[in-house]
Structures are given as C-alpha cells and as structure tokens.
C-alpha cells in the first residue's frame, strides 16, 4: 500500500522484524569501545527520519529492513520494540527530538544547531572536502530520555551505525534514505567554524 499523503507514520516493530541483519563481529567498526559493560534496557526506542521529498515506498522499505535494533542488541542494548516515524520537515524532527518525543533522529546536520541544549550529535555523514554543511546528514539523540542520553548508549549507537555502514545489508537499507551512506562519530564542537560561517550567511540572507 502506498499512502502518498501520509507525512507521519508510527509503527511498533518487534525485535524479530527489526533484527534482519547479520554482521561479522570481528570486522565491525568500534566493537571494543561500543559495548557498554552494563546492559542498557529500553522498552521502546523511538526513531524518526525526515520524510522531505523522499519516495514513500523507499521509506516504508527502510522501516521494514533497517536492522538498527539488531545492531544495537549486539552492543548490549536491549530494546523491546522500535517505533519508527517520518517527520514532515527537518525542523519538525529536530523539535520532536528536542522535546523528547523522539529518541534518535536521522536529520540534516544544520537542523541540530538550534537545539544544542536538548540534543546530542552522535554521527555525521562523511563527505568530501568542500561539501556544504547544509548538505550533510546527521544522527542525533535527545537529552530528555536519560537512558539514551548516557555515554554508554551513545557509544553503542555510534558503533552500531558504523557497523551498518560497513555491512552490505545495512548499507543497502540506509541507502533508501540517503545515497552512499557513510556515517562517522562526531560532536557539535567539531563543526564550530563551519557552523559560525553558516549561521552568519543565513543571518545575512534574512537581513
């Protein structure tokens, strides 16, 4: 079924549905540093993607095939289910993340800048030199959920996504959302100079 008018979808996925990816643990990036010593438990993980101009069928396929829960479970994160939603815009998704109604969001990097006090940047899409900062995608977590705001969950998420990017099945699923996905760990401070230039340019355009 294709619902072209649907801009927000919410679905609870079981672990068996989300856990469709297999990886070689010895080859997965960041395994040693990305596994919390104490299990992290979440009854439901709320994940949101920005719909934008993306094809609805691709987004539905992404929801069904992305093995994020399985990748996190390999890093000692126990998740009962995952609720996947698609935001109407980058700003709407960033606000949902800041409010705490979303735990993890895939969204443009620049959408994170206005919410530095309430969200934490986890990963940024790797890009060639010269790529405009507004063209880079990011993955961020809310600070409102005390479980996902921990260093342990953040490390596990970074390791899980980097492993998915290196895995053929995981990369294929992510490519439904972003062409040639390749995320790397990042912090907001990594983009201080680029952010300042972007905000100065944006302010000048408004004035």
Residue ranges and their predicted role:
Residues 15-19:
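C-terminal motif of bacterial Sec signal peptides marking the signal peptidase cleavage site
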Residues 37-113:
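Extracytoplasmic small-molecule ligand-binding "clamshell" domains
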Residues 26-38:
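Low-complexity, Pro/Thr/Ser/Glu-rich flexible segments characteristic
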Residues 39-46, 54, 58-67, 157-207:
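An extracytoplasmic/periplasmic, membrane-proximal ligand-sensing/linker region
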Residues 21-23:
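Bacterial signal peptide processing site
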Residues 48-52, 134-155, 160:
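A bilobed periplasmic-binding-protein/Venus flytrap-type ligand-binding module shared by bacterial periplasmic
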Residues 114-131, 135, 144, 201-205:
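Ligand-binding "clamshell"
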Residues 1-9:
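Positively charged n-region of N-terminal signal peptides that target proteins for export
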């Amino acid at each position: 079924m294709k619902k072209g008018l649907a801009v927000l979808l919410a679905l609870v996925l079981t672990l068996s549905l989300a856990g469709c990816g297999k990886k070689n643990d010895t080859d997965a990036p960041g395994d040693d540093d990305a596994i919390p010593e104490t299990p992290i438990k979440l009854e439901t993980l709320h994940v949101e993607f920005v719909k934008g101009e993306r094809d609805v069928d691709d987004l539905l396929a992404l929801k069904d095939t992305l093995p994020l829960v399985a990748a996190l479970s390999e890093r000692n994160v126990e998740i009962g289910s995952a609720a996947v939603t698609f935001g109407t815009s980058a700003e709407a998704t960033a606000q949902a993340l800041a409010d705490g109604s979303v735990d993890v969001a895939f969204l443009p990097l620049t959408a994170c800048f206005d919410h530095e006090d309430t969200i934490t940047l986890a990963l940024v899409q790797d890009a060639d030199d010269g790529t405009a900062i507004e063209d880079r995608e990011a993955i961020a977590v809310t600070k409102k959920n005390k479980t996902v705001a921990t260093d342990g969950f953040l490390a596990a998420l970074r390791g899980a996504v980097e492993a998915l990017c290196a895995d053929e099945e995981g990369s294929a699923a992510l490519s439904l959302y972003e062409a040639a996905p390749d995320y790397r760990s990042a912090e907001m401070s990594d983009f201080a100079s680029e952010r300042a230039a972007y905000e100065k340019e944006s302010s000048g355009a408004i004035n």
